[in-house]
């Protein structure tokens, strides 16, 4: 154990020393928290139960609506889009200054997003085919595939906004916010068609993305602006929930008439503004914490494989659920219906098992997140720094800025 700690400390020191002094470590910390929030949120509210011989998804939020505030902690996608807009706007401006073409820049960005996708889609296409050939119920296969593929909507939206960065980087967040408000008013207030809500898939996430782009240009240098986002977004969210008829949960709940997330509603966007305000307020404290080599190394390495963690976390949950069937078909918190507080406590005990399974997936598939050249050499180039070889442990600098 002592040797392991020594080796980890040495690795952390190498990562810390290889990080450029000008790098804003709080950006990486915010991205890491956003990814972990989504992963833990899914693990806490995703249950697989058998009904009428088929596997179905269930959520404790449906049986215990008073748990809705939990979703306020773990629905962190707005922070991810905030960071994404900030990094993309900075990256595009830097690439343009270096004479890099838009095509080369966007290919590099989108490659980092979609390289890991091929592996998860290929594996689950094989698994789904095997299950169907083995006689599994189509509804069971559909439930499993929905859990695996549902994160891909996020990647598609994020990729579209990334590709549009030169066009949207200077748009005021008020414009997409107005689109979201108008779509909701038409849909809920004037009986408009439901499909109009899907306009919010782009407009809703464009709000935090453009906030991030504004951040890259020097906005939010004063705490007052970030505090306004936090307080204003929080008050607006509370008003929309209490008097506007919006659900309190910031994630989808099976059987609910309205989802705040699918597509995003004005309440979800207002809540995202509050999240972004809080994220911008804690930049200073986060930057100070990130000066600790061991803490920074954990954040840096997570950023290096952020997409792998995001894409495979539901596979990890399903793997543990399937392995558990070898021992019992009624393990609390794993196979049982999420209808009581006891289920929540039991599910918490399964989180280390999910994390262990995710670690196995990470070990097997993280290679797909790296550029092909990085797989065959033990050196990498640190972006926005002199192009000299650096230790492999610092490879996060090139791969982490997605």
Q: What residue ranges belong to the model's regions?
A:
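Alpha-helical transmembrane segments and their immediate juxtamembrane cytosolic regions
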Residues: 2-402
